[in-house]
C-alpha cells in the first residue's frame, strides 16, 4: 500500500516521463502506422490509399529478397554465435589462468559501434581479397560471410557473459555427484551442464535472432547491400541488402512516391521483430513455471 501523502506526488514525478513517452514513442508509432496506409512525399500532404502500400511491399522483389537474405543470415549467425559463445564460456569457467583478461578481450568488440566495425572489417576483407583480384562488394557470397564473421566477432563476447552467469549458477554438488557416479566430462556436459543452462540458451537464442533481423549499421558500412544483380524483368536488386537497409533505401530512394511503401515495410518489420520478442517472453515464462 502506498501512503496517501506519497501518492499525491505521483503525477508530478510520473507526468514528465509519461509525456516524454507519448511524444517520443506513442505518437510517432501511431503516426507511422497511419502513414503506412497513405501515399505521401511529405507527411503534410498524405492521403489515404488503403492497403496499396502493403500490396506493393509484398510485390517488391528487393524486399522479398532482403527478407530471405536476412532470415538466412539470422539463422546462420544464431547457430555460430551461440555455439562459439557457449564454448568460450565453458572454457573460461574451467579455472584457466587469466580468465578475467580473456573475458574482457572477448567482450570488447561489443563496445565498438557497428559503423566503425563495418568499415574496419571492410578494409580487412578487401585487403585479403584484393590479392585474389576481387572485393567483398563484387561477390554476394563474400558479402554474406563477411557479415557473418563481423556479427560473430561483435556478439560472441556479449553472449559469453550470459552463458558464464548460467554456468556459474550450477550447484557444485550436482557436478560432484555426476563425477562420483562415474560420468565422463562429455556426459556431464550433455546430461548436467546444458540442461541447467537452458534459460541462458533461450535468452541468447532469441537475442541472437532479434539482433540478426535488426542488423543495419554493419550492413550499411560493410557492403551497403552490394553487389547488384539483374532480374529477368530488367530490374536490379542489391544481393546483400538486409531488411532495415532496404526500408531506408526505399524511403530515401529516387521515387519519392514510394515513401508510403517504405512505411508499410517498416510496419511489417516491426511485427516480425515484435513477434520474436513475444516468443522470447513466452519461452522465458514457461521456463520459470517449470523451475
Stretches found by the model and what they are:
Residues 2-291:
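A structural signal for multi-pass alpha-helical bundles of membrane permease subunits
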Amino acid at each position: 500500500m502506498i501512503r496517501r501523502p506519497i501518492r499525491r506526488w505521483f503525477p508530478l514525478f510520473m507526468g514528465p516521463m509519461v509525456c516524454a513517452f507519448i511524444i517520443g514513442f506513442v505518437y510517432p508509432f501511431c503516426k507511422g502506422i497511419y502513414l503506412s496506409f497513405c501515399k505521401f512525399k511529405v507527411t503534410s500532404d498524405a492521403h489515404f490509399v488503403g492497403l496499396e502500400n502493403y500490396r506493393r511491399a509484398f510485390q517488391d522483389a528487393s524486399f522479398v529478397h532482403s527478407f530471405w537474405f536476412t532470415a538466412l543470415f539470422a539463422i546462420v549467425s544464431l547457430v555460430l554465435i551461440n555455439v562459439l559463445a557457449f564454448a568460450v564460456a565453458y572454457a573460461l569457467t574451467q579455472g584457466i589462468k587469466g580468465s578475467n583478461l580473456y573475458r574482457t578481450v572477448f567482450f570488447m568488440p561489443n563496445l565498438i559501434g557497428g559503423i566503425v566495425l563495418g568499415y574496419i572489417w571492410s578494409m580487412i576483407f578487401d585487403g585479403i581479397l584484393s590479392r585474389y583480384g576481387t572485393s567483398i562488394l563484387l561477390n554476394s557470397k563474400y558479402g554474406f560471410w563477411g557479415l557473418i564473421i563481423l556479427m560473430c566477432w561483435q556478439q560472441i563476447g556479449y553472449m559469453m557473459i550470459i552463458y558464464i552467469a548460467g554456468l556459474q549458477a550450477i550447484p557444485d554438488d550436482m557436478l560432484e555427484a555426476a563425477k562420483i557416479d562415474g560420468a565422463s566430462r562429455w556426459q556431464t556436459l550433455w546430461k548436467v551442464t546444458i540442461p541447467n543452462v537452458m534459460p541462458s540458451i533461450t535468452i541468447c537464442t532469441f537475442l541472437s535472432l532479434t539482433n540478426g533481423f535488426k542488423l543495419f549499421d554493419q550492413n550499411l558500412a560493410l557492403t551497403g547491400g552490394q553487389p547488384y544483380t539483374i532480374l529477368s524483368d530488367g530490374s536490379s536488386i542489391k544481393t546483400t541488402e538486409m531488411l532495415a537497409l532496404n526500408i531506408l533505401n526505399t524511403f530515401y530512394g529516387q521515387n519519392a512516391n514510394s515513401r508510403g511503401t517504405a512505411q508499410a515495410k517498416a510496419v511489417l518489420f516491426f511485427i516480425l521483430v515484435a513477434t520474436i520478442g513475444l516468443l522470447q517472453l513466452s519461452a522465458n515464462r514457461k521456463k520459470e513455471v517449470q523451475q
